[in-house]
Design a protein with these regions (language model features):
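Conserved glycine-rich cofactor-binding loop
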Residues: 14-15
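Conserved glycine-rich Rossmann-like NAD(P)H-binding loop of the short-chain dehydrogenase/reductase
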Residues: 28-43
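Rossmann-fold cofactor-recognition segment
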Residues: 49-64
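Substrate-binding pocket helix/loop in short-chain dehydrogenase/reductase
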Residues: 93-94, 98-106
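Active-site helix of classical SDR
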Residues: 117, 153
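Residue(s) in the substrate-gating loop at a strand-loop-helix junction
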Residues: 137
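C-terminal helical subdomain
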Residues: 177, 197-234
Length: 261
């Protein structure tokens, strides 16, 4: 993709936090390549309305083919910002879940994210500049009872981002981890969690989460927890026994808990 403006690549951009991150980029002087596993026609219209050029790719970033499809769409263009936001969740007990569905969560949240960062991160290091924003989660701070695999993937991402940031500290490439809490997106519907307390209660505005994450990326911060309540939860998680955190998570994510509050 040829562009005279800085180029941002945003994954998971069809809706929610990803869409709002793309709009932040468009409003702040970036042209975009966006990717999701479904149509992004509305996202394209909103991005263009902000004066940015955009190329949209439908790809499953939990597969090697999907990552290659996105890299191919970028071509030889210089990437100034990579916002690796694509991710999936799945509710209910681990042993009751379909294993292939679990595998796809790992492939999307970890393997595909790493593959894309590995490809684009190398070119950023070679060019001596770039910004990487990875969407982690405060879920990575606690054992995810009834979301065991999802929380595990986010624990990986939260840790990985700091390690990569340190490896790149003298290269001109910054790495930032955005750690939201429950946000008003399609996540809980797609994860089959609408019958849970966390799935049915009031959530954060994705536009505000994206604004906070974009600013942290542009400021070169290491991480940012979006929202005061989430900051308190994150701080408490660091001093609370894992057994207690697991029980607290059960009360939020166990099927049927939406009817108990």
């Amino acid at each position: 993709m040829e562009t005279s403006r800085p180029l941002a690549v945003v994954t998971g951009a069809s809706s929610g936090i990803g869409l709002e991150l793309a709009l932040q980029c468009a409003s702040n002087g970036f042209d975009l390549v966006i990717a999701s596993d479904r149509s992004q026609a509305e996202a394209e219209r909103e991005i263009r309305a902000r004066g940015a050029r955009v190329r949209s790719i439908i790809a499953d970033l939990g597969t090697e083919e999907g990552v290659e499809q996105l890299v191919g769409a970028i071509g030889g263009a210089r990437v100034d910002a990579l916002l690796a936001n694509a991710g999936q969740g799945l509710g209910k007990a681990f042993l009751d879940q379909d294993f292939e569905a679990l595998r796809h969560i790992v492939d999307t949240n970890i393997t595909g994210t790493l593959a894309l960062i590995h490809r684009i991160g190398r070119t950023m290091r070679d060019q001596g500049a770039g910004r990487i924003l990875i969407t982690g989660s405060i879920a990575g701070f606690m054992p995810g009872t009834f979301q065991a695999v999802y929380n595990g993937t986010k624990a990986f991402i939260d840790s990985f981002s700091w390690a990569l940031r340190n490896e790149l500290k003298d290269t001109g490439v910054t790495v930032t981890c955005l750690m939201p809490g429950a946000t008003d997106t399609e996540f809980f519907q797609r994860a089959d969690m609408l019958d849970t307390k966390v799935g049915s209660e009031k959530k954060a505005d994705p536009a505000e989460v994206a604004r906070i994450g974009f600013k942290a990326m542009m400021d070169g911060e290491g991480d940012v927890v979006a929202g005061f309540k989430n900051k308190l939860m994150a701080a408490a998680a660091h001093v609370t026994p894992a057994s207690v955190l697991a029980e607290q998570h059960r009360k939020m994510a166990e099927p049927g808990t939406s009817e108990r509050h």
